[in-house]
Amino acid sequence: MRPFIIGIGGSHSKVGKTTVACNILKKFNGWGAIKYTKTSFYSSIIDSPEILQQENKDTSRLINAGAEEVLWVQSPFENLQEVLQIAIDRLSHLKGIVIEGNGAIEVINPDIVFFVSANEDLKRGSEKVLRIADAVMFDRYLPKETPRTATKLHINNEEDYINFIMRRLRIV
């Protein structure tokens, strides 16, 4: 059975995607995480503790937040679906997986899509993920293109997005 998958995308880098992922992982035991980084030429799935636990890396933050397993997927977008499916299969024994990265959200069908935005600006291409977001997490301003159907959550209100997930998991 496929684990419950939460995709976390965002308006641009350094917007808080990893912080949101870490907050989720702190609350849900038995979950793993996949960090996606777009590359130009090669694909890989990194599971080496020496690499994943390097200080100040997003992957080390995910591990420290309590992820049972973390994989770092690196791939050109055109190969991502195949590589990401392999990574998901490797974590299929877990209760859930948090997947970080806009491209990853575009090629899989997460059970929940969170879009993290610090302001109204969007990097090119991120509007695709915004359009399918179940919830938009914002700091000061919602992106202009925020769908009416998306739940609006303040990025600093961790309790609201944990409750959003719990409702989807039918825990509450």
Name every feature range the model reports, one short phrase each.
Residues D89, H93, N102-V172:
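Conserved catalytic-core segment of NTP-binding enzymes
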Residues I6-I24:
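Glycine-rich phosphate-binding P-loop
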Residues C22-S75:
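N-terminal phosphate/diphosphate-binding loop that engages ATP/GTP or pyrophosphate donors
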